[in-house]
Every structure is written in C-alpha cells, then in structure tokens.
C-alpha cells in the first residue's frame, strides 16, 4: 500500500484539551485520505459510544497546523514519516460570526473602535460619530478640519467617556463625553506633528497615548484631563493646546501603526518596511524587524506575544519580536485578493485575529491555519479601511462604502442563547 499517495492507513492518537470531548487514548487506524469531514464523523461516533452526546463540529490540528485537505497531503508537506503514530488534536470549531448591523455614514469610515455598549467611528467628512452596539446613532461630533484617520477610547464608565481622535489636519484631539446629557467637549488639541496623524494608541493605564504620523515621527502625549502643559504659554494652556511629552525619531516614512505592548513599550509599523519596538524609559529603539513590504497596520497580542502585519500585498504575516531572528516571517496567511489594510488580534482568544482588505472583505483567522481563514465576513461593498475586535462580543469594521459593519462574535452569540 502506498500511504503517501493516500492508499492504506495511518496510525493516529486523538487528543483534545477540552476534557468533556476526550475519547479513549488508544491508537486508531484511519485512511490516509481522510479530511476534516471524515474525522468529524469518526470522533463524533466515538463520543456517542462514550456518553451518547450529540454531534459537535471540530477542527483538527496536525503538528500545530489546521488540517485543510487530505491527511496524507498534510503529512507529506510537513515531511512527516507515515510510519510513525501521528497525534491529531481536535478543538471545537469556533462558530461563524453573524452580521448584526450596518451603520450608515455620510462619507468613508476610516476609523472605528468599540468599547462597552458603544461604537466610536471616524469619517472622511471630518466628523466623529457615536453609536450603540445595537445600531442606534447617538451623536455626531465636529472639530477636525480634515479626514479622521484613527480613534481610541481612553476611559469609559456609566457617566463619562473619554477618547482621542487623529486627523489629516495634523492634530490629535482629546474629547470628553457626558453620557447622561449626551454632550461632548474637546478637552485638548494636541499639536506637534507636521503632517497628517495616521495612528493612535492609548496606554494600558489610560494616562498617555501615542501617535504616528506622515512626518515619520512617533509622539507620546499625556491623556490626563487636568494635565498642565509644561513650558507652554499661558495662552496655550487656556486654549487647551497640548504638546508632546516625548518625540521619537527613527522611521523614514509614515508611521501607519502604533500600539502599546506594555506600560513602557511601544510597537510601530511604517511604510518604510519596518516594525520597531520602542523602550520609552530609554526613549530609543529596542528591536527592529525588517519586512519586504510597506506596513499599513500591525497588531500585537498580549496573549501570545506575537505581531501580525497588514501590508501592501495580499498577505498577512506573523513575527515573533522575542527571537534573534525577528525578521524571519513565522507564518504567512493567504486569503485576501487585494492589499490588506487592517488587522487586529482578538483580546480574549489566543489564536484568533481579524483582517480587512481592499477586496471589500473582512476575514476571521486562526493563526494555526495559514492556508485559509476560518470565515469570510461579508457585507462591505467597497474597500475596508479599519477593523476592530476590542469588545470580544463584536467585530466592527469601517469602509469606503460609508458604513460600519457589526458582526456578533461567539461571546455575543452565547449571551443571546442564554437569554432565549
């Protein structure tokens, strides 16, 4: 029998970390041609024999990568001996996110961020908008004089929401929203960049935020409401103008992505084909990762400590900033058909992330499945410009079709099931 060509059988052990789905730990002989369909049938038959449980959809990992075709092809690609007993891990399949809402705007939606019950969006008509996560429009906010490029929440409770926005008008603006009266005021205008401000991220403690700009600079600012601007004139203080606490130079082109990795470390991505990790205590570069494409967006996961990039091609790439071979791509994710504009790790699911691209599509991925996404999240009619999964219950995205699309994730679907 030629097992490598799919003929004959392979010895496997079936393992799971979800104990209630465990099957007897004995070797099983299965055909080399099996796919996830046949493996699902087999595992569910074993579970029915064990406790009569109903069928569950599983995904299967072979040597830390999702099985996406025939087992024999997967083993051959990984150069795994067909004579050895193969360990196959199975996990309950992550359910498909469900479309919930389409939030209509007057112009391109270039920035979106969810927190609690609220969604904050930024548009090319220079306005910000506040929505409930159920799709009700709450407030339109004017102040910027050019298109919005990025937004982030600073803090949020039942009475007050604070957030920051950045714009092509070269400023960042700090806002305070009174939830009860539904009124908002601009607390500070942050001036210091010499070109449009493309990216923003608030520190974990909410006391600072960082911005990246087309002027190639990374700047760190105070996010505190009562902050006095040291060295500023009385007129600047009274007018609410704020200047940066730290300015860091190192990139050669636009700083298109910025994110706090911890209280004193920042990640940036740039059109100059590099990722940089900055140590704020030293005010310098800690690590630099060279890539071969302009970086449109980057996302760091506090759960797995890995970095994803969205670039000027169709691919997403995974990097490990902790290794000496930081510039070596750990994995490449294939699935989009145009430039990938935006990417974000899940904040609660270690292996999951979402992306949005110029092919009008969002995708939900597992980082162990490089050949294909878990799901396509369809709805946008034009390019996707930003995607957010800050609220574990909702995946939200904005695009050139003037909409924010809201998708319910597993946690929201579970809540819905409990209330029925």
From Swiss-Prot:
<dbReference type="InterPro" id="IPR001680">
    <property type="entry name" value="WD40_rpt"/>
</dbReference>
<keyword id="KW-0539">Nucleus</keyword>
<feature type="repeat" description="WD 2">
    <location>
        <begin position="143"/>
        <end position="185"/>
    </location>
</feature>
<comment type="function">
    <text>Required for maturation of ribosomal RNAs and formation of the large ribosomal subunit.</text>
</comment>
<dbReference type="GO" id="GO:0000463">
    <property type="term" value="P:maturation of LSU-rRNA from tricistronic rRNA transcript (SSU-rRNA, 5.8S rRNA, LSU-rRNA)"/>
</dbReference>
<dbReference type="GO" id="GO:0043021">
    <property type="term" value="F:ribonucleoprotein complex binding"/>
</dbReference>
<keyword id="KW-0853">WD repeat</keyword>
<dbReference type="InterPro" id="IPR028599">
    <property type="entry name" value="WDR12/Ytm1"/>
</dbReference>
<dbReference type="Pfam" id="PF08154">
    <property type="entry name" value="NLE"/>
</dbReference>
<dbReference type="GO" id="GO:0000466">
    <property type="term" value="P:maturation of 5.8S rRNA from tricistronic rRNA transcript (SSU-rRNA, 5.8S rRNA, LSU-rRNA)"/>
</dbReference>
<feature type="repeat" description="WD 3">
    <location>
        <begin position="192"/>
        <end position="231"/>
    </location>
</feature>
<feature type="repeat" description="WD 4">
    <location>
        <begin position="250"/>
        <end position="288"/>
    </location>
</feature>
<dbReference type="Pfam" id="PF00400">
    <property type="entry name" value="WD40"/>
</dbReference>
<dbReference type="InterPro" id="IPR015943">
    <property type="entry name" value="WD40/YVTN_repeat-like_dom_sf"/>
</dbReference>
<dbReference type="InterPro" id="IPR020472">
    <property type="entry name" value="G-protein_beta_WD-40_rep"/>
</dbReference>
<dbReference type="GO" id="GO:0070545">
    <property type="term" value="C:PeBoW complex"/>
</dbReference>
<feature type="repeat" description="WD 6">
    <location>
        <begin position="335"/>
        <end position="375"/>
    </location>
</feature>
<feature type="repeat" description="WD 1">
    <location>
        <begin position="104"/>
        <end position="142"/>
    </location>
</feature>
<feature type="repeat" description="WD 5">
    <location>
        <begin position="290"/>
        <end position="329"/>
    </location>
</feature>
<dbReference type="InterPro" id="IPR036322">
    <property type="entry name" value="WD40_repeat_dom_sf"/>
</dbReference>
<keyword id="KW-0690">Ribosome biogenesis</keyword>
<dbReference type="InterPro" id="IPR012972">
    <property type="entry name" value="NLE"/>
</dbReference>
<feature type="region of interest" description="Ubiquitin-like (UBL) domain">
    <location>
        <begin position="10"/>
        <end position="92"/>
    </location>
</feature>
<comment type="similarity">
    <text>Belongs to the WD repeat WDR12/YTM1 family.</text>
</comment>
<keyword id="KW-0677">Repeat</keyword>
<keyword id="KW-0698">rRNA processing</keyword>
<dbReference type="GO" id="GO:0005654">
    <property type="term" value="C:nucleoplasm"/>
</dbReference>
<feature type="repeat" description="WD 7">
    <location>
        <begin position="379"/>
        <end position="417"/>
    </location>
</feature>
<protein>
    <recommendedName>
        <fullName>Ribosome biogenesis protein WDR12 homolog</fullName>
    </recommendedName>
</protein>
<dbReference type="GO" id="GO:0030687">
    <property type="term" value="C:preribosome, large subunit precursor"/>
</dbReference>
<dbReference type="InterPro" id="IPR019775">
    <property type="entry name" value="WD40_repeat_CS"/>
</dbReference>
């Amino acid at each position: 029998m030629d097992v490598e060509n799919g003929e004959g059988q392979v010895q496997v052990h079936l393992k799971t970390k979800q104990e209630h789905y465990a099957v007897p730990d004995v070797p099983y002989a299965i055909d080399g041609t099996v796919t996830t369909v046949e493996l699902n049938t087999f595992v569910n038959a074993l579970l029915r024999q064990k406790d009569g449980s109903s069928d569950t959809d599983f995904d299967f990992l072979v040597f830390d990568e999702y099985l996406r075709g025939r087992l024999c092809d997967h083993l051959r690609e990984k150069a795994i001996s067909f004579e050895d007993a193969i360990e196959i891990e199975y996990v309950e399949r992550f359910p498909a996110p469900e479309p919930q809402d389409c939030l209509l705007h007057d112009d391109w939606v270039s920035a979106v961020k969810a927190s609690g019950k609220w969604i904050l969006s930024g548009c090319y008509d220079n306005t910000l908008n506040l929505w409930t996560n159920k799709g009700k429009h709450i407030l339109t906010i004017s102040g910027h004089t050019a298109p919005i490029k990025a937004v982030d929440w600073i803090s949020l409770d039942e009475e007050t929401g604070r957030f920051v926005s950045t714009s092509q008008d070269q400023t960042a603006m700090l806002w305070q929203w009174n939830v009860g009266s539904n009124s908002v005021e601009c607390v500070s205008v942050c001036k210091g960049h010499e070109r449009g401000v493309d990216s923003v991220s608030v520190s974990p403690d909410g006391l600072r935020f960082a911005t990246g700009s087309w002027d190639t600079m990374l700047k760190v600012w105070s996010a505190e409401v009562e902050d006095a601007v040291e060295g500023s004139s009385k007129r600047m203080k009274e007018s609410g103008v704020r200047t940066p606490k730290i300015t860091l130079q190192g990139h050669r082109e636009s700083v298109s992505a910025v994110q706090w990795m911890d209280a004193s470390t920042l990640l940036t991505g740039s059109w100059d084909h590099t990722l940089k990790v900055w140590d704020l205590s030293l005010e310098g570069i800690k690590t630099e990762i060279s890539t071969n494409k302009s970086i449109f967006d980057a996302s760091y996961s506090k759960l797995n400590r890995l970095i994803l990039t969205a670039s000027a091609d169709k691919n997403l790439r995974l990097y490990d900033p902790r290794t000496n071979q930081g510039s070596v791509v750990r994995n490449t994710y294939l699935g989009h058909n145009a430039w990938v504009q935006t990417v974000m790790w899940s904040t609660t699911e270690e292996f999951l992330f979402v992306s949005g691209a110029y092919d009008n599509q969002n995708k939900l991925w597992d980082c162990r499945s490089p050949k294909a996404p878990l799901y396509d999240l369809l709805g946008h009619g034009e390019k996707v410009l930003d995607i957010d999964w800050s609220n574990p219950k909702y995946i939200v995205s904005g695009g050139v079709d003037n909409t924010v699309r809201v998708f319910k994730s597993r946690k929201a679907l579970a809540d819905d099931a409990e209330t029925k």
